[in-house]
Design a protein with these regions (language model features):
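Terminal amphipathic alpha-helical/low-complexity segments used for targeting or macromolecular assembly
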Residues: 1-113
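Structural signal for interior beta-strand "rungs" in well-ordered beta-sheet cores
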Residues: 115-140
Length: 140
């Protein structure tokens, strides 16, 4: 299952951040996400997750914006997406959280543990983070 989940996260990253990763065929990646999810969950849950990808992407873009707008060391948003470990963690968390909400067993916890192992940052898939808004004191 871990190999499937690792592949899922590669696809989710490309699906959510195509503008930063030179994505060529987002529709193909979404179909691949659905295919992987059908191996770990039933068809209804897989389809429900795919329907939530636009909202997951929106939330992750607000995460990127909050970092880019508040960290004076940031050069641009591409740097945040490619280099900041917290974005990897948030991608795993937001994916895992959605799967948990849909009642998919085991996979949500494995996803957050994969991110924890890679970054040292641990967020339980049941945590409620919500939208991260840019600060009113963001740099100009």
């Amino acid at each position: 299952m871990e190999e499937l989940l690792a592949e899922l996260m590669v696809l989710m990253r490309r699906t959510v951040f195509p503008e930063f990763l030179g994505q060529e065929d987002r529709d193909l990646d979404v179909m691949s996400v659905r295919s992987i999810l059908r191996k770990i969950a039933d068809e209804g849950r897989a389809d429900a997750f795919v329907a939530r990808i636009p909202e997951i992407a929106r939330l992750l873009h607000t995460d990127v914006d909050a970092i880019a707008d508040n960290d004076p060391a940031v050069i641009d948003r591409t740097e945040v997406v490619l280099c900041y470990p917290c974005i990897k963690v948030m991608l795993h968390y937001r994916t895992a959280h959605e799967l948990l909400q849909l009642g998919v067993p085991v996979a949500p916890r494995l996803l957050t543990e994969m991110a924890h192992s890679a970054t040292g940052i641990d967020i339980h898939p049941g945590a409620r983070i919500g939208e991260i808004s840019p600060s009113t004191t963001a740099r100009a």
